[in-house]
Regions:
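Hydrophobic pocket/interface hotspot
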Residues: 22-26, 32, 57-59, 76, ...
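Hydrophobic-ligand binding "helix-grip"
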Residues: 34, 63-117, 154
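Short, hydrophobic/aromatic-enriched beta-strand segments in well-ordered soluble domains
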Residues: 13, 119-122
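Hydrophobic ligand-binding cavity/cleft-lining segments
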Residues: 1-48
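Residues at helix-coil transition
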Residues: 27-28, 81, 157
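Residue-level preference for beta-strand/loop junctions
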Residues: 5-7, 53, 68, 101
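A conserved amphipathic terminal alpha-helix motif
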Residues: 123-157
Length: 157
């Protein structure tokens, strides 16, 4: 895991499943609610599978300190089947343009014997200071990333 002073968390977990099975969960927005340990991520508004960079998918979310219910629009920034998937969360402005929040999620999958090493990176280094102060970024500690990978492992079974 990275040092807590960095503006990112990086955690790796070996999951006893092939990369394709893990990637199938990550590329399915409807299953994202099963990849986090709480009840923050809700149902996907866009349930089509993720197929490449530039694709946008929306997910319903809930966080008290962010005002309760909201929709997060994610733009896929990396997509290599069975290897890498990443997205940049944000909101849509009045014209429908994606406005990034300044944080991103990335999963890197590496075969390891009969399993897969899954590295999850959460980076908030580009998040505006005003938003950091208002919501408290990061809104969770590094243990949330570890618990997210455990949830992903359960979702893959």
């Amino acid at each position: 895991m990275t040092a807590p002073t960095e503006e990112r968390y990086v955690v790796t977990r070996t999951i006893p499943a092939p990369p394709a099975k893990i990637f199938a969960v990550l590329a399915d927005p409807a299953r994202h609610k099963h990849t986090e340990p709480g009840d923050w991520v809700r149902d996907a508004e866009d349930t089509d599978p993720i197929t490449g960079t530039g694709q946008m998918f929306a997910v319903n979310m809930f966080l008290d300190r962010a005002g309760g219910h909201y929709v997060m629009h994610n733009v896929v920034t990396a997509f290599e089947p069975d290897r890498t998937i990443a997205w940049l969360p944000g909101q849509l402005d009045e014209s429908g343009k994606h406005s990034p929040g300044g944080w991103w999620w990335r999963y890197d999958l590496t075969p390891n014997g009969t399993g897969t090493d899954v590295t999850l990176t959460y980076d908030w280094s580009e998040t505006d200071q005003g938003f950091r102060d208002a919501v408290g970024v990061p809104v969770f500690g590094p243990e949330f990333i570890e618990e997210s990978l455990a949830a992903l492992e359960r979702a893959v079974r």
